Amino acid sequence: MPATPPMPGYDAVAVPVLDSTLGNTDIMTRISLTFPTQLSLALLQDSWYELVRAWPILAARVRHTPSTPSGLSFLIPQPDKVKELEQRSRTSHKDQEKHIVIVDASSRSIASFHPITAKAIQSSLSRDTVSVGAAPDNADSLKMTCSNATTSLKQLLRADQAYITAHATVWSDATTIALAFSHIAGDAFSVKAIFEAWRQTIESAAPAPLQGVGVDPFITYLPPHGKNSKSEDTDKQGERDVGLPLGFFQYGFIDKVRLAWNLISDIKIKRPEKKFGQYYMYMPEEKVQALMAQARADVDALVSASDDSEKQALDTRISTFNVLLAWLLQNIHAANPKRKRMSTVMTIVNAKTRPPARHDPSDYPPHQLWGGALGVPLEPLASGDYASLPLGQLALHIRTSLTAQIDPANMQANIVTLLRHTRWAKPSGKLIFFARPNHYLSGCTEWRSTRFGELDFGAAASPPSSVKPVAIGTDMEIAVSKRNRWVIFGDMGGGVWFSGFMTDHEATHRDGFGRYQHVQ
């Protein structure tokens, strides 16, 4: 791909190297929040433009620049260009030329768009069990949450459109706001920071300009010459190459063939793509507490059955996340036909909160618009064990696996491996994979720690009041299948939201999600 010629009115800043790895460049994402009342479209629109004037990187274009380590640059508009883009956005009749699209759908109830969200708006979801509902119609969802967004990196690199766009839709009984973005924008903490800045702008004034734009938090981990790309060798009082992180394998030819066959047979024969849909689950707080009590009882029983030496070595701490993920994995695996087949689950850890070895705190920029999320595998289990082990025992398995993964040396190995093999500008061509080729595969992102449910946009209500979201939505554009991908959104509207992609058979399996209340 040829380099992009200079664009007048923009300042080029390199995309950070970790954000330019293929797991980020290949994904275009959107996140929506739904509030249980009408908010002012005018206030939402004007405050968005005010925020962009304070943080012009939100209006950045992305272009190919071979001179940067990542191969990509943000082209950040200068003040006069920001004004020009705002004027175009406000007056254009083309959604692709608008930085924020506002939709007055006040003639429609949100129930016509997403029934399970409508139940949340009405506070009528069950307090006794989990509720399950299908995602909105895809065409309607695009129209109502991201009609101005680019849908691929290829399009983004050519389009005169920002890599982050906003959307606001008012229904007769609710308001949905959304951000659509290339995943090079960062992680869930990055998106939360933008929503929070938008909220702050409505309530009082735009935040101060971002400091440290252009600082690359992981450039020192870039092989082969980055000062942190090697690990300390205490035996030889020197340095050595960083190996693969826990649970990752470098595939040879035979493994590649086996993996390709397993994926193709699943996609083309066993579970064709047309059978998949996106589903949402809402777990009320009462159910969360019941699961926590059940898991603690399971752990107590495990301790009681252990001998004295095992008891001393057994760390029985489990978190709410451990239990929620254990519950989700039990239900996901219930429909798997081969119970003895091993299963590997990838989940997320974050270098923002779990820094890698050799990390210097001054390397991290003071703003949040960069990513630190890393995908790591849990220790494999047989599919039948995931489906049938006691909840607390499975939660312990998750916690133990993640404890090993967040070791600083392993975090360093994750970052160095990603930069060595999957950088968009220079992939190695080697296949580094998180599971054996014959395993069941699934992945789950965790967003609970970002606390999206605390965002209060009540300053845009009439009269102003406290208005927090009661439902959250997401989707993504990706070149490969979305199957087996899940997210634990976190607490909102008096419960915890989940979403993922599965077949109708899996969504209604009698030993899995079929046990719960399905919302039509």
Curated annotation (Swiss-Prot):
Gene3D superfamilies, alphabetized: Chloramphenicol acetyltransferase-like domain
Listed pathway(s): Secondary metabolite biosynthesis
Assigned keywords, A-Z: Acyltransferase, Transferase
UniProt-listed Enzyme Commission number(s): 2.3.1.-
Signals that turn on the gene: Expression is induced when cells are grown in cultures containing vegetable oil as the carbon source.
Applications reported: MELs not only have high potential as eco-friendly biosurfactants due to their excellent surface activity, but also have attracted considerable recent interest because of thei runique properties, including self-assembly, anti-tumor and cell differentiation induction activities, and moisturizing and hair-repairing properties.
Broad EC category: transferase
Role summary: Acyl-CoA-dependent acyltransferase; part of the gene cluster that mediates the biosynthesis of mannosylerythritol lipids (MELs), surface-active substances that enhance the availability of water-insoluble substrates.
Protein family: Belongs to the plant acyltransferase family.
Name assigned to this protein: Acetyltransferase MAT1
Organism: Pseudozyma antarctica (strain T-34) (Yeast)
The gene coding this protein: MAT1
